[in-house]
Amino acid sequence: TKNNVVAVWSGIMLATSLEFWIISHAIITDSMLMLFTVPTLLSAYIGLMENNRRHMVIAYFSSGLACLSKGPVGLVLPGMLLLIWCGLMRNKKLFLRLFPWQGILIFFITALPWYACMYAIHGDPFIREFLGLHNIVRATSSEHPGDNHFYYYFLLLPFSLLPWTGLFFYEIKKQWKEKTSFYLFLMVWCFGTLLFYTLMATKYVTYTYIALVPAAVLAAHAAPDVTSGKKIPGLLAIIPFLLLLAALLAGTFFFPDSQWWPLYIVTAYSVWVLLFRWHKNSHRRLTAISTVTISALLVTVNAGLPAYMHTRSGYIMSDYLHKLPGQHYFFQSYSASFSYYTGETATRLIPILPSEDIQNIRDARWKEKYAMPSITEEEFLKLKKEEPVYLYVSKGNLSRMEKWSLNNRFTVEKEFIDGTIFKLEK
């Protein structure tokens, strides 16, 4: 049936979308948040539409697990989305079904014990750090001011969903007139999530992660049209796919020493199957796109990740800096990998930056994020420096280092892909 086809392709399109594929291979809490947010929303939808209290209890239980994974957002976000959807449905019964006492009870039984234990063990620091800094401050003050733009997520979503972006927008337009309850639910889930995080001051690429689920489900509704040979959905499936391949091929030029020939073979195969055999393989287009996408991403990771890793990891730098005799400092930002790889706890140096750079500096409340030893520029100048002093500056901070008043007192010791080690001249 059509529903079975849509269900299967929903999973395939989600698994092969660019951002989902990347984040799902990373060790971050967003994956666990999605794992429990999806059943929260889908079970709530079934429970509300069918007046099924068991599904509502499952939704509240899942929301409790989501709160244990990444804090109050596990309840606040799905709760807000469901309230908006109920409002659009204009059905008072849905609002009444949304708050069963059994579900609320199971939520507190699931989430409250951990929060109570953390407060009993840590007291006010738990409230101040976890709930205050990592929730309230994150929402009201940007951790990365340069990324705080209203269009951030709406621009990011089309790239995150590649190669299924075209089918996503195709289905949005196709189903717009009918506006079924499930269509409205998916639209609220997707764009409500983007709007929610747009209103938050701190912007992260990973925040669009949850929005990929409804986007993939919408895109999957176009699968029957593509496999039946319809021209427009067929083109909207292939063009974004070719753009993704082109982007991956362009990325190979940044790492010329890697072995990219498998990616070239995969690309040639996809061009032959999808372009030269366009009319003969209409029923296999989605299968070819998903298979080639997985192959291309696997090749990219295996060939490119070892080279790319050194631009994001301080493994080589850490070993070199650790072996240098003397005092070790980090300019403005602290590389956690240094302590991980060496066992040494270095000191973070907080410089006094020129006024024109102040707009890019975080709110002072973010200083509580740094648990490692820190020293101000004034304190650094007062220290007795009887042994050599080395300062590591990440690539992103090199421009600030050049504007720093003490810049001329340092000389380059060693350059790396991800930054530079400087030595203080006596």
Which functions belong to the PLM regions below?
Residues 57, 171-426:
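Membrane-embedded architecture of ER/inner-membrane glycosylation machinery
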Residues 1-232, 282, 344:
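Membrane-integral, polyisoprenol-dependent glycosyltransferases
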